[in-house]
């Protein structure tokens, strides 16, 4: 384990030790040997949200998307109340309690999370480019609100089945995230409620 890996794992442990919250994975135990630190986390046999969506052809009901979005938002609100920016929100870090449609979701993988005081800002790079806020991509200072941008990206994916700014070229993703609006003219937009349209466009 490199020093960087150890630092990320220690950061994750400190954050996981803080809370017990329904939509955040629980840390059950910690043990180590001479070379490895082990975390025992609760079992979530449904896999991650990306696989859940992929198994359904990235096509789920709006009502199901609403439940997932609300669960993610309440988890982020809880983290932010403790001054913690999650900083790596993406479907691969959202675990499912089962493979069924009514599965509960829990945030996992807090290695990139960071405590940011109310009047503090950070310019530390992080995360996955398709889900990161423009200020992060530009190397500018940011606060905990960058998680809300990532929530918007995940919400867009849940209702549309696609990412709002997606390309094999990372430079183009950056350019589109900064300069372009997502596609609101595709057929999927006509299939969701007025409230859903309003939320996604925010």
Predicted regions and their residues:
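Activation-segment/catalytic-loop signature of the eukaryotic protein kinase fold
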Residues: 30
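Conserved short submotifs of the Hanks-type protein kinase catalytic core
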Residues: 34-48
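Conserved catalytic-loop aspartate of Hanks-type protein kinases
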Residues: 147
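Conserved N-lobe beta3->alphaC-helix segment of eukaryotic protein kinase catalytic domains
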Residues: 1-19
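Protein kinase catalytic-loop region centered on the HRD/HxD motif
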Residues: 74-84
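Activation segment signature within eukaryotic-like protein kinase domains
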Residues: 68-69
